[in-house]
Amino acid sequence: MQAMLVEAEWAPRGGVAPEPGAAERRLARNGNLVWRRPRFRVTDLPEPPVAPDEVLIRVRACGICGSDVHLYERDAEEYMLYPGLVTTPVVTGHEFSGVVERVGSAIVDFQPGDAVCAEEIAWCGACLACKSGQFNYCSRLEELGFTFNGAHAELVVTRARSCWPIHSLVRRFGAERGFVAAALVEPTSVAYLGMFVQASFRPGQTVAVIGGGPIGLAAVGLGRAAGAGRVVLFEPSAARRQLAEALGTDATFDPRALGPDGVVRAAREESEGRGFDLWVEASGAQGVIDTATRALAPTGTVALIGLGPHRADIDPVTLIRTGSGLRGSLGHSGHGAFGNVIRLMAAGRLDMSRIVTRTVGLNQAVGCLEDLRDREAGKCMVVF
């Protein structure tokens, strides 16, 4: 089968001491500290075996995520920009949908021919976090497309418990568009968890989103679908601001033109002077967290979803005086996120397929990574 693979050199930065056994496993907790000179290529790999609790899926659509672009990009010292859990070599791709090709011997809930999408988070089920229902914070976490082979490939294997049926999306949108929409359930569920679970968003509250990539655009669409009193987006790309308008944002702004103080002023004006109840930070850009805290409503929340290699400076006095706070959010598992997002899409309340601005075959995927470095386009989708 054909697949897109990333490889890199194991070269821990000076002063970085990887945990015992990490070099042998080629597993970095923070790729930006360890992996140097990442390289992508499309190659032929053998068809993967299927364990009793797994399913083999023929991929129909797989998005290229901002995280994939961070795996591709290098800093001044040629380290990959991605600051999360990753091993190499690995097949990338974690936002996908497809058709079940074969099931493991223990599987009763799926059969060949079923249309599915799947969660990227592979939790162990046995650690304290998993026993507490906090699957995204599993101490033995594995991630499809980062620590085991993902779906930028003709075939992918994953555990059946990670899969969700998507027949309702195929019925609503038709096969071609339905599989594309289903591949967007994963990034939309990331935004869903950050907004509704971690930040406890409620209808009528106001939402400001930083970053108009797929997760930021999903936050715009979810805010509108869930009855936000006002939704605004801060995003440098004019093309992405237009996509947000199609999803129902009330206003969009270019933060580079405004500067940090201008962003605060615009946010105050858009919220009648009180600040926003919820800021969704989906960019991973430097300096934006402090800006958001300066335009928070009393007891408001900044949901931190975007991953970036930069450290943040914030003024805790601002948070104390307003009773507001920061909430980190990682992943999408648990809390019914996937099922709820699928139902929102199938009901016509949320159409994330609107953000797809380019579809390519697998052989064009590496070029798409290069093109996405300018953060100007919407979602690039690899289709099979």
Task: Please state what every model-predicted region is.
Residues 250, 286-347, 384:
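Glycine-rich phosphate-binding loop and adjacent beta-alpha segment
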Residues 191, 207-224:
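Glycine-rich adenosine-cofactor-binding loop
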Residues 83-94, 124-210, 232:
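NAD(P)H dinucleotide-binding glycine-rich loop of Rossmann-like/cofactor-binding domains
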Residues 11-61, 87, 106:
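A short N-terminal beta-strand-loop micro-motif at the entrance of redox/enzyme domains
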Residues 174, 209-212, 224-291:
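Adenosine-nucleotide cofactor-binding segment
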